């Protein structure tokens, strides 16, 4: 598999797996993070993904893991600013797609960001929804 050369969008499932040793994707997420660090790959995300990640880590892992994400991983991220037009577009995507597929509103926002603002860059996610939306997904 050819990995991204210079930039990638990161989803909650990727961040969660990278910090939770009990997650089945923990080792793969760690390998991908190391690859990005070694190859200067820019990690893009949104505040919505950060919020979802911190919440998931707090409830499914623990407080310290959530803070570790905020203190160590978040500073290394390029956070894409999302205005109301992104959220309005995400509402349309959610209403169109989520009836037949289990798509969260956060994932709808990510889809709009990736396709309209980031020129369809690849994604690091373990969430099958991204692939079903036609996005390029690793791993």
Task: List the predicted regions and their residue ranges.
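Active-site neighborhoods of divalent-metal-dependent phosphate/nucleic-acid chemistry enzymes
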Residues: 3, 79-121
């Amino acid at each position: 598999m050819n990995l991204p050369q210079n930039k990638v969008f990161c989803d909650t499932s990727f961040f969660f797996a990278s910090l939770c040793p009990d997650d089945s994707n923990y080792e793969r997420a760690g390998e991908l993070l190391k690859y990005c660090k070694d190859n200067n790959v820019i990690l893009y995300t949104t505040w919505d993904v950060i919020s979802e990640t911190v919440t998931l880590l707090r409830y499914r892992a623990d407080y310290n893991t959530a803070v570790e994400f905020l203190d160590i991983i978040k500073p290394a991220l390029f956070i894409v600013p999302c205005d109301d037009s992104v959220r309005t577009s995400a509402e349309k995507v959610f209403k169109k797609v989520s009836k037949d597929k289990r798509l969260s509103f956060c994932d709808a926002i990510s889809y709009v960001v990736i396709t309209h603002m980031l020129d369809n860059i690849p994604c690091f996610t373990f969430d099958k929804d991204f692939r079903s939306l036609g996005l390029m997904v690793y791993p």
